[in-house]
From Swiss-Prot:
Membrane topology, as annotated: Single-pass membrane protein
GO cellular component assignments: plasma membrane; proton-transporting ATP synthase complex
Functional description taken from the UniProt entry: F(1)F(0) ATP synthase produces ATP from ADP in the presence of a proton or sodium gradient. F-type ATPases consist of two structural domains, F(1) containing the extramembraneous catalytic core and F(0) containing the membrane proton channel, linked together by a central stalk and a peripheral stalk. During catalysis, ATP synthesis in the catalytic domain of F(1) is coupled via a rotary mechanism of the central stalk subunits to proton translocation.
Family of this protein: Belongs to the ATPase B chain family.
UniProt gene name: atpF
CDD domains to which the protein is assigned, alphabetical: ATP-synt_Fo_b
Keyword Transport belongs to the record: yes
Protein's name according to its UniProt entry: ATP synthase subunit b
Length: 169
């Protein structure tokens, strides 16, 4: 104890200071350190949660970017397929229209040929009738002086028959 007294320490005073120190430590621990630790722990938890959310957002962004690329690739592929289908359809439609136009033009040409042939035949018949009439008149004038009436009739009928045969052939 002598050593303690040499340093100037008094046991009672030291004991009171020790009790005061323990009371202050208890009060600080109870009312300051506990709430402060709680606030710091809550802040640490929020920071960790924010970091985790940021990491999740980064992963979600990467996934969205990949999905976007996949969707764009599918859309491009679909558009290319659709364009190819449209081109084929247009080509088929064009070819079909050309074929139909050719068939229609051939049909029109055939109809025109038939009409021309019918018209030609009709004109030939008319010309034949006119030539028979003219021939008959010419023959009756020419033959009127040379032959009798019955001979003229026979000759005329034979001549007209031959002309009719020539026209029909």
């Amino acid at each position: 104890m002598e050593i303690i007294q040499k340093f100037g320490l008094e046991a009672k005073l030291f004991l009171f200071q020790l009790i005061n120190f323990l009371i202050i430590v208890f009060i600080l621990k109870k009312f300051l350190f506990a709430p402060l630790k709680k606030i710091l722990d809550e802040r640490k938890r929020k920071i960790e949660q924010s970091l985790q959310d940021a990491e999740n957002a980064k992963i979600a962004l990467e996934n969205a970017s990949e999905k976007k690329k996949n969707i764009l690739a599918k859309a491009k592929s679909s558009a290319d397929t659709l364009m190819a289908t449209v081109k084929v359809s247009i080509k088929e439609t064009k070819e079909k229209a050309v074929i139909e136009a050719k068939q229609r033009s051939e049909q029109i040409i055939d109809e025109a040929k038939q009409k021309a042939a019918t018209e030609f035949e009709s004109m030939n018949k008319k010309i034949g009738k006119i030539s028979v009439d003219i021939s008959g008149k010419v023959m009756s004038k020419v033959l009127s002086d040379l032959f009798t009436e019955t001979e003229k009739q026979k000759l005329m009928s034979r001549a007209l028959e031959k002309i009719d045969e020539n026209i029909k052939n």
